[in-house]
């Protein structure tokens, strides 16, 4: 039920107002005379599904072209808990995502519109934003209104499920590569507003304690599931600092001439899927707070290690990689580019060998969190006072759940067996 209770809007952000809703409704419908009559705000993400922002679904009732209209949008807002904001550096991540939508996606939209291919952009449309470091929010179209539904982050995905996401990444990365090939200076200009929010040496003191807990959990899993094996012995000598520094190195030494604007955080909760009338499956990608310029392999690796199970990796790993590259080739051809001129299969497979470790290293942080049930997830709004480090909130410990522990150990074993570590 909608109302005219302005406190509902203020619960999103003190700067999220009725005027904001009107501007959003105008952009959404194209009617400059649209009128907002009432609204409602409800939570749009479950506990444990989103840590860096508060996600709400806002219903807007109004008059469009003189007729009653109801629309829903998604609003990502910086948490109102000031301690939480400080601990998690929320403003840095919001600044990065705002730049992604206002600079990078704006360029992609312009590029695709000129080619009559805007429908290829599988990213929610940005309908409004505010960025001041304290009251930030981003308003996005509601993918549910287009038939998309969320994904269970606790389940391990099978081959056919993974193909849907690999195709979605081929589409998104293919657009990025086509823009790079055809409008390189414009892309470089747009991406200069992105700022690495995690894997840079200055953030080790902020991130290192928690990342060490994650690697400790993975080492414990290996010791219990694969004790005394060469893989367990190799991983036992690996430190969190070495893995973190390797990620920093890969970002600093990437091939500056060939890159995509990575999603950066490709675990299950950042996708929604739907079934099209012809029976095909489709996916949309969202939550770009970790967007960065890097090899597309990073997104694929992170997805593989946080979402798939051992059986899927063992049977279909190479198939998925080839499927992705072939799908990207088709998208780029549709946009007037030849993938073989910029990112042939040989270069892609070379980057798999060299760069897959990035998704492996980052995935070891995310996988333990992704396997927590809602009851086990951390309540970030309980943070008050002098808590200064994320490790004081994300008090991750080795799991006693054998299924989850084996899943974590199998990720480590796969990375080592394939020479990524």
Question: What is each PLM-predicted segment?
Answer:
Residues 330-421:
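Helix-rich C-terminal or lid/interface subdomains of diverse kinases
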Residues 236-240, 282, 321, 335-346:
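Plant-skewed but cross-kingdom recognition/interaction modules and surfaces
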Residues 16, 96, 160, 164-167, ...:
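Generic recognition of stable, solvent-exposed alpha-helical segments in well-folded globular domains
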Residues 49-63, 74, 239-296:
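Active-site acidic catalytic loop and adjacent metal/ATP-binding pocket
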Residues 99, 103, 290-334, 359-391:
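Active-site activation/catalytic loop segments of kinase-like enzymes and analogous catalytic loops
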Residues 2, 7, 144-263, 272-278, ...:
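ATP-dependent phospho-/nucleotidyl transfer catalytic cores
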Residues 42-216, 292, 296-297, 312, ...:
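Conserved ATP-binding subdomain of kinase catalytic cores across diverse folds
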Residues 2-41:
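Juxta-kinase regulatory segment immediately upstream of eukaryotic protein kinase catalytic domains
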């Amino acid at each position: 039920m909608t109302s005219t209770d302005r406190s509902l809007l203020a619960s999103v952000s003190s700067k999220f107002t009725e005027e904001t809703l009107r501007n959003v409704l105008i952009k959404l419908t194209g009617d400059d005379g649209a009128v907002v009559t009432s609204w409602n705000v409800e939570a749009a993400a479950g506990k444990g599904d989103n840590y860096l922002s508060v996600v709400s679904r806002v219903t807007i009732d109004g008059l469009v072209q003189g007729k009653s209209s109801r629309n829903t949008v998604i609003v990502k807002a910086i948490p109102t808990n000031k301690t939480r904001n400080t601990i998690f550096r929320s403003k840095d991540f919001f600044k990065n995502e705002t730049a992604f939508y206002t600079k990078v996606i704006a360029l992609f939209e312009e590029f695709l519109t000129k080619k009559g291919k805007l429908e290829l952009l599988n990213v929610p449309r940005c309908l409004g934003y505010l960025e001041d470091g304290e009251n930030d929010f981003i308003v996005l179209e509601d993918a549910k209104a287009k038939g998309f539904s969320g994904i269970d982050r606790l389940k391990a995905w099978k081959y056919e499920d993974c193909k849907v996401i690999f195709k979605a990444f081929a589409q998104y990365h293919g657009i990025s590569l086509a823009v790079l090939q055809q409008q390189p200076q414009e892309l470089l200009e747009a991406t200069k507003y992105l700022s690495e929010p995690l894997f840079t040496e200055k953030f080790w003191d902020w991130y290192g304690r928690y990342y060490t807990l994650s690697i400790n959990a993975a080492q414990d899993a290996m010791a219990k599931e694969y004790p005394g094996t060469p893989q367990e012995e190799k991983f036992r000598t690996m430190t969190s600092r070495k893995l973190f520094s390797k990620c920093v190195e890969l970002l600093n030494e990437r091939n500056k001439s060939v890159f995509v604007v990575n999603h950066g955080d490709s675990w299950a909760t950042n996708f929604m899927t739907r079934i099209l009338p012809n029976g095909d499956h489709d996916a949309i990608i969202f939550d770009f707070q970790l967007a960065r310029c890097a090899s597309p392999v990073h997104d694929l690796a992170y997805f593989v290690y946080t979402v798939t199970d051992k059986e899927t990796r063992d049977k279909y790993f190479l198939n998925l990689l080839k499927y992705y590259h072939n799908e990207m080739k088709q998208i780029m051809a549709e946009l007037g580019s030849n993938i073989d001129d910029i990112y042939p299969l040989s270069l892609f497979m070379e980057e798999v060998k060299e760069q897959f470790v990035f998704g492996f290293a980052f995935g070891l942080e995310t996988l333990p969190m992704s396997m927590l049930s809602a009851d086990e997830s951390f309540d970030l709004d309980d943070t008050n006072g002098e808590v200064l480090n994320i490790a004081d909130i994300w008090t991750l410990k080795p799991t006693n759940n054998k299924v989850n522990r084996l899943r974590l150990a199998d990720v480590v074993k796969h990375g080592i067996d394939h020479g990524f570590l």
